[in-house]
């Protein structure tokens, strides 16, 4: 879950208080590299989605209770995210500021929803700030799904902090991490009338954030080549890693994404300016949007192409498209020679979009050089391509995953079969053996 370059210099104050100097010193001297893996801490409500490529990454989702009793030290931060990559902080918590002040705003601003990486509705907090150490209308958070596969990690959670509004609103957040690739964060607001929705992304003070166009923001370390100034000397963490934040094109969110500044509190009573990306829209509910976070290294930054359909015009930068149909919501991410499709069922019935049809709750595909290179199906019993069976599970499955580059083929439960069409689309001759290994057989002829 941590970078192999973990050192005492990068430890937070909280870790030192929790484990003590002796434990910190032992960790700094450790010769074995910590394992990078996703892990859940359900009792505390923390879910860590981790990856090791192209460098160590860990996103922490806060899905726990706001606090004990009236949540004196709690913040209104349900479903907020924090992200570390390549040994440094990227998406951060705003801190606490001060506890006691003549102006209540000094205390309430940094413990409010707007100071965290989550959704705010109608400009109000998820809970109602009372005294400096108490809240009312404290939300309840539910974790609806958690899967840590070999080539992906998936989290779904929701909270009812806005149920107190005249038109009650529920915020549901999906986080899907593709190993070695993109993060897709899907935010849904369930309600019946028009509301102002806002998602804020707070970045560490030592990062440079540039709006490249209305739908894409580039985040880089200060002094890196990506920021346009001379690169710093030292490790990749000091100059090569970067992040692209992409919102869907041709949506109200695309034109309402802005880069500004805010204040963080790295220690009690201390404040520091830091970059903030604010995405907002006034929309009729139910409504949703997605944010793609694409890690990169400056030295291997890639150009892009188009997505689900083959033979499409090349593009120079990553683009995220959003398409909604009656039964499925689709997000398409295009970059380099890769096309990434994210399909989310909107109900219990089967759906179809383009060449794909399935009863899976979530489907992900990566097409590279006109070949299927990665496939994930969460829930459901089948996946089909152009009306022909591709994959079949014996019953509703937790998930199925296949990835070409490292021979991953995995499912829970393990009773599934792939057809000859699967080999045709993937060029993977291992599919027949995979069927035999799982006491299954192909069930359709090659078309």
What are these regions (language model features)?
Residues 1-91, 148, 284, 317-423:
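Carbohydrate-active enzyme catalytic cores, enriched for enzymes
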Residues 53-56, 65-68, 86-90, 96-99, ...:
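Short, glycine-/Ser/Thr-/acidic-enriched flexible segments
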Residues 424-447:
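Short, low-complexity, charge-dense intrinsically disordered segments
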């Amino acid at each position: 879950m941590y970078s192999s370059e973990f050192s005492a210099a990068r430890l937070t104050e909280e870790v030192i208080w929790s484990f003590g100097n002796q434990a910190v010193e032992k960790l700094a001297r450790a010769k074995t590299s910590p394992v990078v893996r996703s892990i859940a801490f359900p009792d505390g409500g923390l879910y860590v989605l981790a990856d090791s490529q192209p460098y160590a990454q860990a996103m922490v989702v806060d899905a726990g209770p706001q606090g004990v009793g009236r949540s004196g030290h709690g913040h209104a931060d349900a479903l907020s995210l924090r992200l570390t990559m390549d040994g440094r902080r990227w998406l951060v918590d705003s801190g606490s500021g001060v506890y006691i002040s003549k102006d209540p705003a000094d205390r309430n601003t940094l413990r409010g929803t707007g100071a965290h990486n989550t959704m705010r509705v109608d400009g109000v907090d998820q809970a109602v700030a009372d005294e400096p150490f108490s809240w009312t209308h404290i939300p309840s958070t539910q974790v609806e799904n958690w899967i840590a596969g070999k080539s992906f990690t998936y989290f779904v959670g929701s909270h009812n902090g806005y149920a107190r509004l005249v038109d009650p609103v529920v915020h549901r957040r999906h986080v899907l991490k593709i190993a070695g690739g993109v993060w897709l964060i899907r935010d849904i607001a369930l309600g019946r009338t028009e509301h102002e929705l806002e998602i804020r992304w707070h970045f560490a003070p030592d990062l440079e954030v540039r709006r490249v166009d209305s739908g894409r923001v580039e985040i880089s370390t200060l002094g890196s080549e990506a920021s346009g100034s001379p690169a710093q000397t030292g490790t990749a963490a000091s100059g090569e890693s970067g992040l692209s934040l992409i919102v869907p094109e041709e949506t109200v969110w695309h034109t309402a994404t802005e880069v500004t500044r805010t204040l963080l509190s790295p220690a009690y009573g201390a404040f520091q300016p830091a970059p903030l990306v604010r995405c907002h829209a006034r929309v009729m509910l139910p409504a949703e949007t997605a944010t793609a976070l694409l890690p990169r290294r400056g030295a291997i930054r890639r150009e892009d192409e188009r997505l689900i359909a083959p033979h499409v015009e090349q593009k120079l930068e990553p683009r995220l498209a959003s398409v909604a149909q009656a039964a499925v919501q689709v997000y398409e991410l295009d970059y380099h020679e890769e096309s990434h499709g994210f399909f989310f069922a909107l109900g219990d019935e089967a759906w179809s979009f383009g060449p794909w049809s399935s009863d899976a709750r979530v489907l992900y595909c990566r097409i590279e050089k006109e070949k299927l290179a990665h496939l994930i199906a969460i829930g459901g019993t089948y996946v089909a391509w152009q009306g022909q069976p591709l994959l079949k599970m014996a019953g509703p499955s937790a998930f199925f995953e296949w990835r070409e580059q490292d021979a991953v083929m995995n499912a829970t439960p393990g009773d599934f079969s792939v057809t000859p069409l699967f080999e045709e689309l993937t060029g993977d001759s291992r599919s027949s053996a995979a069927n035999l290994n799982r006491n299954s057989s192909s069930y359709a002829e090659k078309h």
